[in-house]
Amino acid sequence: MADKVLKDKRRLFVRSVDMGTINGLLDELFEKRVLNHEEMERVRCAHSTVMDQARVLIDSVLRKGPNACQIFISNICNEDIHLAQTLGLSSGSPSGNDHTKLDSQVEVPSLPAFVENMPGPTIPDSEESTDTLKLCPPETFVKMYKEKAEEIYPIKERKDRTRLALIICNIEFDHLSTRDGAELDIAGMESLLEGLGYSVVVKRKLTAKGMESVLREFAARPEHKSSDSTFLVLMSHGILNGICGTAHSVENPDVLAYDTIFQIFNNRHCLNLKDKPKVIIIQACRGENPGELWVSDSPKASTDSWTHQPLMLQSDAIHKVHVEKDFIAFCSSTPHNVSWRHITKGSLFIAQLITCFQKYSWCCHLEGVFRKVQQSFEKPDVKAQMPTIERVSMTRYFYLFPGH
């Protein structure tokens, strides 16, 4: 019975589910009248941590019996494939009524022609090395394309699309310290984005005016018209409201405001990317505060390969009065705080970002991958920082479907 299966998976569910999946499950369960409005709000509002919300959610469903549990299991399988695999769940064969409801409410667009005869990769075992990009099997791609047709950004066929990505990385500066280890960030991000199907443009050693010029040239590229998305990766020293050019000093600021980036790529100035995901990743400090770094109630040796002596870590912070700005981006730290970079291994944020894309982008949408990165920084230690998702204006889920 579904209730027995779900009860056996309770502890693992509480430990594994993330906030995005909880919100998706709540919406589905409310729509299907498994939970009423009061029960849904009790989960969302009465408990502050993800694990607390997960406990209340699964216990509320268990109390409602086998049918409610089966609906819950089916929604997990549809909402979060990675979580379903972690829990060892399968939705089984949906009833005819479910198919009728889906087909009558959603007009599913025809699948891209290349899907029908596409040979697909196998899913790597969970214990395999995660230093390569896991590919999305055709059956998973087809399933998600059908079931989430109205919820996801469409992707273009590989043979016709011209995806572009831009990496800007400043390493050496006229007045600021050299960002040792940043070359590894460039190499890692370039390899990742190429694996995701993007042609990557890399620019180094630019002033703020130079960065703005490169961004405007990139936004004007005609290839964006036949693309379905773009990535912008900016890595440099930074302050709260912008990223530093190579000529920056306290006396003579050389800063590209983050807001300028969004103006360049908005629908008024970049029509070729209208209605397409524009992902901005920023590796830079946003202040000087080190947060909880080096603070511990009971210091002990760590087996984490990132744990090194303090002198091996550098900060990308510089001195400036902070002015709050909002932007849509995945930033390497919270406002007013530093981001850490190892002088021989590269930036901690970029390394975790690459790992999570390699491991989860085959089954998770973009914000789900970003949350996996955040979870890897959840417990402050020698590398204390908290990546932050900001200025989100996406109206659909963005799945990268690596391999397609």
UniProtKB/Swiss-Prot annotation:
Chain ranges of the CARD domain: 1-91
Gene Ontology cellular-component terms listed: AIM2 inflammasome complex; IPAF inflammasome complex; NLRP1 inflammasome complex; NLRP3 inflammasome complex; plasma membrane
Annotated catalysed reactions: Strict requirement for an Asp residue at position P1 and has a preferred cleavage sequence of Tyr-Val-Ala-Asp-|-
Top-level taxon: Eukaryota
Post-translational modification: The two subunits are derived from the precursor sequence by an autocatalytic mechanism. Ubiquitinated via 'Lys-11'-linked polyubiquitination. Deubiquitinated by USP8.
Residues at the active site: H237, C285
Signal peptide (residue range): none
Prodomain positions: 1-119, 298-316
PROSITE patterns per the UniProt record, alphabetical: CARD, CASPASE_CYS, CASPASE_HIS, CASPASE_P10, CASPASE_P20
Keyword Phosphoprotein: yes
Matches recorded under InterPro entries: CARD, Caspase-like_dom_sf, Caspase_cys_AS, Caspase_his_AS, DEATH-like_dom_sf, Pept_C14, Pept_C14_caspase, Pept_C14_p10
Gene Ontology molecular functions: cysteine-type endopeptidase activity
Modified residues annotated as Phosphoserine in this record: S302
Keywords, ordered alphabetically: Apoptosis, Cell membrane, Cytoplasm, Hydrolase, Membrane, Phosphoprotein, Protease, Thiol protease, Ubl conjugation, Zymogen
Role played: Thiol protease involved in a variety of inflammatory processes by proteolytically cleaving other proteins, such as the precursors of the inflammatory cytokines interleukin-1 beta (IL1B) and interleukin 18 (IL18) as well as the pyroptosis inducer Gasdermin-D (GSDMD), into active mature peptides.
Subunit structure: Heterotetramer that consists of two anti-parallel arranged heterodimers, each one formed by a 20 kDa (Caspase-1 subunit p20) and a 10 kDa (Caspase-1 subunit p10) subunit. May be a component of the inflammasome, a protein complex which also includes PYCARD, CARD8 and NLRP2 and whose function would be the activation of pro-inflammatory caspases. Component of the AIM2 PANoptosome complex, a multiprotein complex that drives inflammatory cell death (PANoptosis). Both the p10 and p20 subunits interact with MEFV. Interacts with CARD17P/INCA and CARD18.
Protein's UniProt name: Caspase-1
Origin species: Canis lupus familiaris (Dog)
